[in-house]
Amino acid sequence: MVANPGGGSTDAGGGPVRHIPVLLDEVLSALAPAPGKLILDGTFGAGGYSSAILAAGAEVIALDRDPTAIASGQAMVAAHGGRLKLVHSQFSHLADHAPQGGLDGVVLDIGVSSMQIDEAERGFSFQKNGPLDMRMSAAGVSAADVVNRAKVADLIRIFHFLGEESQAPRIAHAIEKRREEKPFETTRDLAGLIELVTPRKMKDKIHPATRVFQALRIFVNDELGELAQALFAAEAALKPGGRLVVVTFHSLEDRIVKKFFSDRAGKASGSRHLPVAHERAATFAAIGKPMVSASEAEAEINPRARSAKLRAGLRTEAAAEAADMSLFGFPNLASLGKLGG
């Protein structure tokens, strides 16, 4: 499944975008903000969730790894008289900015923000020509670095696993051939090549470059690793009765959140080899339905909501468990950081 990261386009790479928080009513229902409560918004973005949480009377610690979002949010900080603390940080580091076991709620809205899609110079959209960057902050390798330097086998892994792209080998080999002549510099450079290699068919609902752009963005920003670390950090930071609410936009993210809550439900998992499994105390209990999606009415108003899924859990009295990345079963794509040396 490929998400539309914002606005009035069904293409995952761009289109006109509205700054509308997705599943806002459902998020507030699951999060239950109220006066006297301290909520951490791990993905401040344009401030949609934080604004609604503040309106309910709670105090907010809001994080964002994008310095542009932090700068844009200063007016909101000034308007709320100390009830909003805005921090430049990745949400995987939320434990550094919140009292351990002291939060009443954590909300995470995963993926690229509508503001980032709007800015062509950030390189997130194949519909807006700009530098092939895709970094949510200025640190680390860019999408151009990956496309121009990664081994073909590594490009195939990235496109196949993170983009669920069935044409990954064909696209990767075409990239290798083209970059020998001229390096990729812009989003249109890459999107144009993909269009030539895998032309759009009449039945296709998404642009041919959608899955590759998604894969590169996720890889460059280590989005799956960030999400997994944030879930573990939230488990330790929430007080008993605290609420963890996560909104995702594609199947890889949702799979991680689903697996986390399933594991933290504490149910023993024996097998024919080890029929008696150790019973574990649940660290989270379910809040409402296992998964909530947007109504047709919301999806019509905000197309980004069409692929959104919300999962939520209520923190129990049990001690937080150790972080274990092997729980999620995805390959260590971070090992590709050398990009072919």
Curated annotation (Swiss-Prot):
Tell me which InterPro entries the record gives.
Answer: RsmH (IPR002903), SAM-dep_MeTrfase_MraW_recog (IPR023397), SAM-dependent_MTases_sf (IPR029063)
Q: Which UniProt keywords apply?
A: Cytoplasm, Methyltransferase, rRNA processing, S-adenosyl-L-methionine, Transferase
Determine the domain of life of the protein's source: Bacteria
Q: Is rRNA processing set as a keyword in this record?
A: yes
Q: Does the keyword Zinc belong to this entry?
A: no
Spell out the family assignment given in the record's similarity comment. Answer: Belongs to the methyltransferase superfamily. RsmH family.
- NCBIfam families, per database record: 16S rRNA (cytosine(1402)-N(4))-methyltransferase RsmH
Q: What is this protein called?
A: Ribosomal RNA small subunit methyltransferase H
Q: Which organism is it from?
A: Rhizobium leguminosarum bv. trifolii (strain WSM2304)
